[in-house]
Amino acid sequence: MSGFDVFDKTLEFAERNYYIDIADKLPVFLCSIGSHIFNAINKCSRCDFDPDSPLVDEENDFTIINCPLRHGNLPIYTPHSRLADTRINIMLRGPKGSGKSILILMFLAEGAGLLDSPNQDMGVGFRTMMGPNSVTEAGMFGSVDEEGNIMGRPLARELCGGFLGFEEFSSMSDASKKDHSMDMKNQLLTSLDNGRVQKSMRAGWVQYTTRYTVWAGTQPARFELDSGLDRRFFIIDIDMTPQKEREYKKAQHRASNMAVEERVELANLGIELKSWIRNRMETAIANPPTGVIFDDDIGEWLDHPTVRSFESDLFRRLAIGYHMMQPDYHGGMPLLVTLDDRLRQLLDDSLAMRRTVMDADMELIRSTFWKQDLPKSQVVKEVSRMVTNGDYQSAKRWITENLELQSWYYEYEPNTNRRGRKGILCRFGPDAGDEI
């Protein structure tokens, strides 16, 4: 379907279904799909679940017989001489009733979701699933029986190459605090970063590489950024106001009273969108790009001071995904990633949402200790209490990655002649960088 603009058509589909406040959010989901396809092009020539691989015992090992993402091509994107991961995992952060689940279900709902495929086990379309409300480490990543074999059907393995949704991400973060799932967070971070799952257990190893993308919702008070989740997730911020709540009520009423003719038209448009996304995946896998070239405008945008160094790769992935989902696709040549007006607006909006979330904790620390000089040990304790939920090591890392980059924060060793340990003091204030 040459000329079919999936960004415009998906927005039309959502607006005619009376979705509220989605114009700056839907493109991120589409870019996530595009970057997921690109990641498969780059990494799925090696598959731990390929029944034809000489390293896989088809009778005893878990296999995915029909995977539409599996291919025999060489990697095309290897910055720093490493095999880069380009998945965009999405975290929707918003209060209860703000429409987080509705956005995820628009793509992943069984039957009606734009990515759902009834024949996914036969290799048609993506593998998709809405995750359970409660999950353990063993249920997510696997455990072994007395003979060292992986038990059950761990989600991270089952959804390799697909999309896994969670209506409330706290079900996973809460599980990591229980004795039976202490390693949940570390396994999650690693599997989202490079796909590796590796657990040493008394009876054997849980070891495989998976390539699933996570879309999840969370409420602000339940969102923990202290352990590296912020580097693995693209954050979409959803605010809720009395006016927006009234708009939601009106939208629900209109959607309930939709005419039959309109429902039929929207069903056909949904089928078109499903078909286009599936065809784009199949076309790109069969005829992949030969490399990636970012133009200077992309580099200039990423060089902006408000984009932190560890965030630049997330926005680079967004740009890749955006171009993988353009109306006209050309394989067999490098993917030229340019900065058009729509991509620039998408990057600007995404950065603004990310700053709102990422800087909330920093503003709390700044306003609490403004114009004070505190011992470094006390600052670490306060950050641990206020930001990182009692994790002392995460608090020290948070200070290094966030506070130390601010012009209003300065660490110094006081000039004093008194005996004993001097220690480091931390100054919060407009003159933090002045000579002490």
Model-derived segments and their meaning:
Residues M1-A14:
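Conserved ASCE P-loop NTPase core motifs with emphasis on AAA+ ATPases
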Residues A14, Y18-I20, L26-P27, C31-Q243, ...:
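Conserved ASCE/P-loop NTPase catalytic core
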Residues N417-G420:
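Short acidic/glycine-enriched loop/turn segments that link adjacent beta-strands
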Residues R16-L26, D303-S312:
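Structural motif
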Residues K25-L30, R316, Y392, K396-T400:
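Short, well-structured alpha-helical segments
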Residues K199-Y212, P220-E363, W370:
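Phosphate-sensing "switch" segment of ASCE/P-loop ATPases
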Residues S2, S81-R82, R355-T356:
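Short helix-capping and inter-helix turn/linker motifs at the boundaries of alpha-helical repeat units
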Residues K96-G97, L105, G332-E401, S407-Y412, ...:
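C-terminal engagement/docking regions of AAA+ P-loop ATPases
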